[in-house]
């Protein structure tokens, strides 16, 4: 009779060296493999996490909302794209934080590595430096511009992007102000370091936000059936913005 522990160790060794795409297929082979890979804190996911993520990120407070090795790895794979941002932006070694260089008369944006056209998705945005005169968070398609002259609300300036300007509490799309947000009397302004949760519902075609675990309401409706990417645009020199993908939002 084969020792179950032996089987476990063999599977662990094999799965630790497979590509992530192969692990997804392996989980569909049988119930045993599915349950094995469903343990998000197993040594398999720990190994892949250690192999992919910068060491400084794994135990960082930045990832406090993603508590397992698998969710940390998923967040990293969904983080800012160093190849899809303004030339005045670079992604820091932790992989989750963008830094805007102090370039005068420029507005600069960055998109995430992965966009969505199906399902429900949530991510956190943390502005870790001064906002400046304009600081916008939201979504865009691949067609939206990532750099322009001057200090403007770049995200939301065309029909390919939708944003919330944290400085003035305005919603922006197609170059127009779509209204105040949130719809509260004397709505408090964003404070540097606060975590804002962005919720994209591709099934209902809506974009919403939460702050301090309070749902702020639906910001945009009627979003197009296109792949939409987490995006921010910034104007302040040396400001930094982090983004952590959370997965499917929990209702309530």
UniProtKB/Swiss-Prot annotation:
It is found in: Synapse. InterPro entries: B30.2/SPRY (IPR001870), B30.2/SPRY_sf (IPR043136), ConA-like_dom_sf (IPR013320), F-box-like_dom_sf (IPR036047), F-box_dom (IPR001810), FBXO45-Fsn/SPSB_families (IPR050672), SPRY_dom (IPR003877), SPRY_FBXO45 (IPR035784). Its main location: other. CDD domains: F-box_FBXO45, SPRY_Fbox. Pathway: Protein modification; protein ubiquitination. Residues 1-48 form the F-box domain. It holds the Pfam family F-box-like. Residues 58-250 form the B30.2/SPRY domain. Keywords: Neurogenesis, Synapse, Ubl conjugation pathway. GO terms for cellular component: cell cortex; neuromuscular junction; nucleus; pole plasm; SCF ubiquitin ligase complex. GO terms for biological process: negative regulation of gene expression; negative regulation of synaptic assembly at neuromuscular junction; neuromuscular synaptic transmission; positive regulation of protein catabolic process; proteasome-mediated ubiquitin-dependent protein catabolic process; protein ubiquitination; synapse assembly involved in innervation. Required in the presynaptic motoneuron to down-regulate the levels of wnd and restrain synaptic terminal growth at the neuromuscular junction (NMJ). Belongs to the FBXO45/Fsn family. Component of an E3 ubiquitin ligase complex composed of hiw and Fsn. This is F-box/SPRY domain-containing protein 1. It comes from Drosophila mojavensis.
